Amino acid sequence: AKLNRYAADKGVKLYNRKPFDGDAELLKFQIDTVADLREEFNIKEPLQLGWKRMDPDDFGETSSNHQQVWINELALRKRAVTEKNLTADKYLAADTAEGIAAHEMGHVISGKIRNGKSGLDIYKETVYNVSGKRISDKEALSLLIENVSEYSAAVTPKANGVNVCNEIIPEILSVNYTKPNKYSKEFVRLLKEACGL
C-alpha cells in the first residue's frame, strides 16, 4: 500500500497483477524515473507501471497504447545483479537500473512525436547540430552502435516493407537520464521540439 501511495503521489499508477516481492527501493527508483520523464515531457495521460515475469534477457516492455510500462520482475530484486546483467554484453546503453525505466519511457515518448520525425531523423539532426557534419542513415547507424549501443541501431522491418529503428529514442533517453553527454542533451532538446514542447 505504501508503494501504491508513493507512486500515486507522483502521478504513476502501479499495475500490480501480483504482489511485489522485490526490492522496494529499486521499484521506487523506477517510479521516480517514470515520474521525472512524464513531467519533463509534459505527459498528461496517467501512466501505469507494473512488473511481470519476462524472458531473463528482457528488462522491460511498453504497451502498444504507450500508457503501460512493464519491468521484468527479476530486474527488481537486487540492484547489483540487475546492473551486472545490464552490462554483461554491452548490448544496451543502460548500465544502471534507472536506465530500464528511462528506456521504456522512450517508447512512451516516441508515441508523442507530432512532427513526423523518426528517432533516426532526430539523431542525424543532433549530429549535425553538435559536430556540423551531415551523415547518411548508414553512417548514423554506425555512430549509434559506436556511441550509444548496439541495440539502438536495431532495425525492425514493418509489414509494409519499411525498416524502422524503434530503439533509438529509448536508448538515447536512457543515456541522457543516466550519463548525459552533449549529444544526448541535444537529442533530447530536439525530441522535445518534435513532441511540440
Give the location of each predicted region.
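Active-site-flanking segments in enzyme catalytic domains
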Residues: 1-197
